[in-house]
């Protein structure tokens, strides 16, 4: 009888220990899954903002511009219509204010680092808003794509944060040399970059 009690006690202890190990392994698995889910959430949590471009300077230029921030990079995509066929400049300007009929309420090019105007990434210098030129097709339509790690959406770095600025499309092309703005002509479309 004593042997049976000892064997029963041993079985209970073995079963209890086994359950404890299973529970410990289960908790480790749960922790691993939760960590993986957190990593996926961080990767997926891209910030996307979209704005409509307003015609300026008696033009018919309109469209949408989208900013997508993901993995430390901001991608801008602009879909435009109503342009004259050919080359046009697109820049980020200082103020998210498109109230003036000529778009000049948006101020000059966004230039937080006080560099001379120039082509993007030029060794002689460039404004953080100097996106560059694009080509409108024969129907006056254009798609502009631009990506950089030198911008952010709402971060604390004023040398990178484009919130509170404006996107301006110009009548002509940027020559990348004329100071302070590239002699790109009238502002034909504008939108503020606001959250």
Q: Which role fits each region the language model picked out?
A:
Residues 5, 20-87, 94-195:
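N-terminal leader/targeting pre-sequences
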Residues 1-7:
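Bacterial N-terminal signal peptides that target proteins for export
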Residues 7-13:
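Sec-dependent N-terminal signal peptides
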Residues 15-18:
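C-terminal motif of bacterial Sec signal peptides marking the signal peptidase cleavage site
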């Amino acid at each position: 009888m004593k042997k049976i009690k000892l064997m029963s006690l041993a079985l209970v202890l073995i079963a209890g220990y086994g359950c404890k190990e299973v529970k410990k392994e289960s908790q480790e698995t749960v922790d691993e899954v939760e960590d993986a889910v957190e990593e996926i959430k961080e990767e997926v949590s891209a910030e996307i903002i979209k704005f409509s471009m307003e015609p300026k300077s008696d033009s018919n230029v309109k469209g949408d511009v989208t900013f997508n921030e993901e993995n430390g990079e901001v991608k801008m995509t602009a879909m435009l219509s109503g342009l004259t066929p050919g080359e046009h400049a697109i820049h980020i300007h200082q103020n998210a204010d498109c109230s003036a009929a000529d778009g000049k309420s948006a101020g000059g090019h966004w230039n937080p680092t006080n560099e001379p105007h120039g082509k993007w990434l030029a060794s002689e210098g460039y404004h953080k808003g100097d996106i560059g030129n694009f080509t409108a097709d024969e129907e006056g339509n254009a798609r502009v794509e631009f990506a950089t790690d030198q911008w952010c959406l709402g971060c604390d770095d004023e040398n990178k944060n484009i919130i509170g600025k404006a996107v301006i499309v110009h009548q002509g092309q940027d020559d990348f040399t004329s100071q302070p703005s590239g002699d790109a002509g009238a502002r034909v479309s504008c939108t503020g970059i606001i959250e």
